[in-house]
Amino acid sequence: DNVTGGRLLDTTFSVRAAAGTAPIVAARYEFADASLRFLRIMPLLERAAGVGFLQDHQMIVSLDRGVVSAPQGGLVNAAGTSFVILDTRIKGGDGQVSLALDGSITALMSLLDVEPLRLISKAGQSVTLADGRGSVSGSLQFPLRKGVPPNQIKFDVAATLRDVRSQTLIKDRDLRASRLALAADNAGLQISGPVTLDGIAANGSWNQQFGAAGRGRSQVVADMALSQATLDTFKIALPPNTVSGAGRADITIDLVRGQAPAFKLTSALRGIGVAIPAIGWRKAQNAQGALTVEGSLGPIPRVDLLELSGGGLSAKGEIILNDQAALDQARFSQVRIGNWFNAPVILRGRGKGQPVGVLIGGGTIDLRGASFGANGGEAGPMSLSLDRLQITEGISLTDFSGDFTGRGGFAGEFTGLLNGGPAVRGTVAPQRGRSAIRVRSDDAGGVAAAAGLIKSATSGTLDLTLMPASGAGSFDGDVTIRGLRIGDAPTMAALLDAISVAGLLRQLDGQGLAFDEVDAKFRLTPSQVILTQASAVGPGLGISLDGIYTLASKQIDFQGVISPLYLLNGIGSFLTRKGEGLIGFNFNLTGSAASPSVSVNPLSAFTPGMFREIFRRPVPEVTE
């Protein structure tokens, strides 16, 4: 049944026998133009030529030439293939085929997929999984009897696949390779080597496990190039200008029959720059980082998890694409940047070529280290609803809400509660690569009290401007208050008592002292308020002040002049500072801001205002 034709050449046959022993049979023959079948499961081998041996209870047939007409894909060259019956004395013993096949990939795959092998079908693939050429080597071992079940066929096959092209291994993805290695045994099937996937270079393997555990599923594991082109190829839509440079990533793709391929990509981001311009963060290409992306590939990919760290940032979220596979939302449940940003962030797509919109709901931002506006480029709208916006040590806005744009820098309007107290409103504008702030309130006294400056202040309107100054987290401030009233204030009482102004003391204890105008200039740093010039004037009193307030310890070191009866005394103020009359008392306030030490120089009252400088130290200086 296994030989249907051919010619025998140079046949030799010998039998040796000795008394009491089984005869020893040996033979050698050559054959040509043969049509034969090595295996019942395989197609007929045609135009076969080779040599056969029978020796030492083994039969060996080796092909010098011959072709197999595969079920699909054309002819396969089988030259070099051999067949061995391992022990002719055992009926139904094992036979072994050593394969040497060359042909189209489709033809080779169809031979590996004949019943009962079904190696390719077991992998959930078609024999037309790829175009190209291939060479197969390896062995098959099986019992020589009819009806052998597949689990009794042992195989270990290797193949080299050349000029490979496939859109089947990974559905709808163009996979190409100049050379791939195939390995198959009873445990599973693997195809590995360098490839391009839709033009993206990768080096990896496709693995299929046989048996119930691997039925209908396989896996691709690869090391691949990572750049903006990679993201574009896989339709992973990130905000514009997110990725620059190029590096490597490890990717795993799980292929399950009837489902979109699921993937996981990880990278140390070496050589890759990553930026979120909308919140002022950037990782340089030479900086270390970490990226994890998990989701599924399909007409509209999904990114269920995106974790990013590096350059002081850690973020975790997901990406949602719209029906056109463009960015709808990038939702991050938590984003941390250094010690200045800790909040959830949503980035909203606004169409091709448009900067994303930003929604920050909850969390905290510390403007002392913020880099909003530092990029100075085009940016989309930003809406913030923060638990706290920290401006400097001891000064923050809670329940902060604002809407901003990034066009040319960070700018917009906001509302909030100063240190959880009085309501303020304001504007932010880009300045010197940072943010300038203007704050206004209809409760100047409440603002002064909430800031810890004057606990008993009430009424009045406030207009405060903070301009970025040299040094991180430093601002030059200018404040204007109109209509302020100060009630029970121990420090003020101590000053008035020291200069024996009984009427003003009674006024302080009653309805409070009125100050029509309060003006100040100062430098705000992360650790200090440096008051360079301040004045408060009202009908009964004028005050000038300068010095330093240390924020962390709440210690003060101020000096100034207090001028009673300012309505009359202030007539000569053009010769002095604002808030000082012709007659005034030099004073110093030192120690705790809550309960400072008060000292007054009574002799200064007899010194004309223009010469009063002899009783005071120089005004604190600030660098430009």
Language-model segments: which ranges?
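Solvent-exposed beta-strand/coil patches in large extracellular/periplasmic or lumenal scaffold regions
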Residues: 1-88, 119-210, 218, 248-323, ...
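Predominantly extracellular/luminal regions of secreted and cell-surface proteins
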Residues: 95-113, 486
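CBM-like, beta-strand-rich accessory domains located in the C-terminal region of large
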Residues: 108-123, 127, 215-221, 225-235, ...
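Extended Gly/Ser/Thr-rich low-complexity repeat segments
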Residues: 111-115, 453-455, 576
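N-terminal accessory interaction module
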Residues: 331-347
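Flexible beta-edge/linker motif
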Residues: 346-363, 469
